[in-house]
Amino acid sequence: MQTLKVDLGERSYPIYIGEGLLDQPELLAPHIAGRQVAIVSNETVAPLYLERLSKALGAYSVLPVVLPDGEAHKNWETLQLIFDGLLTARHDRRTTVVALGGGVIGDMAGFAAACYQRGVDFIQVPTTLLSQVDSSVGGKTGINHPLGKNMVGAFYQPKAVLIDTTSLKTLPARELSAGLAEVIKYGLICDKPFLAWLEDNMQALRALDSAALTEAIRRSCAAKAAVVGADERESGLRATLNLGHTFGHAIETHMGYGVWLHGEAVAAGTVMALEMSMRLGWIDQAERDRGIRLLQDAGLPVVPPQEMTPAHFMEHMAVDKKVLDGRLRLVLLRQMGEAVVTDDYSKEILQATLSADYRAIVAQL
């Protein structure tokens, strides 16, 4: 087992990474204050791991809360089901909410914990690659709104993150690829050697090689922890973690939540960010193509939806959380391994990026 730390002073917490951690209650016990635990999961993950985790937490009074699965259910109605369960079971302020599942479950369970009786403890137990390397670390919680993704939520840090890498053995290939989009992001924005490592190890990752996956998770979490420790509430540096997300969130919102997986939309959005970075003269064509190839090798879509026009993108991006004073800030690459958050671009460059023929770009690789 490996242990990392998210350094936030008195609110610091550990990230445990290893095999079989779901069966080690001694890892969670120090982070559970009371006798009540609510495990929030979904209809897909619960049959696989809920009984196992409940057994490990047998010393506590365990309440299972099983939600419908999918991004389409990341809303107020589903959030109320968590509150219904907690209130019906008379859970008090010393309860601990445990999020067992992917990013949707982590975001909603964390938001419920932030709100319930004005805040109770919670623990992240992510079971997808995307949630293990990204959404479980950093305290972003929330739900979607019909007009925009993750527009209702709170910064609320967990007490611990427990990553059992064996859970990836039950992950569908499409979900694994979606998680790799976030892994690749770290190489692009802040770790050029990691980018080269990913190029050398992509096939091992897709084949679920345990050593390769553990290393990718460790390096991704270390990068995320360092950024969160320096900028918890996304006032500057942390926003660079959103490479590809502004374009990607527009895709998710327009196509309907869940039609494109989050990681798939981020991948296509990252291609657009690479294209715009090249048009600004910050990276060259070979570097743009290198990024696209790596996303392709991960089994990800690299062409935005053909039915989305530049006007569609602009409509949805206008609701992005990085808009300040009416000006859209984008995360782009100043160079490979270095990202910036900027509004220093012309409308012409943005329009050219939105109008680019990505099918033709990919065809020439």
Swiss-Prot record:
One Pfam short name: DHQS_C
Database matches in InterPro entries: Dehydroquinate_synthase (IPR050071), DHQ_synth_AroB (IPR016037), DHQ_synth_fam (IPR030963), DHQS/DOIS_N (IPR030960), DHQS_C (IPR056179)
Gene: aroB
Gene Ontology MF annotations: 3-dehydroquinate synthase activity; metal ion binding; nucleotide binding
Listed name of the protein: 3-dehydroquinate synthase
Entry keyword Amino-acid biosynthesis: yes
EC numbers for this chain: 4.2.3.4
Essential cofactor(s): NAD(+); Co(2+); Zn(2+)
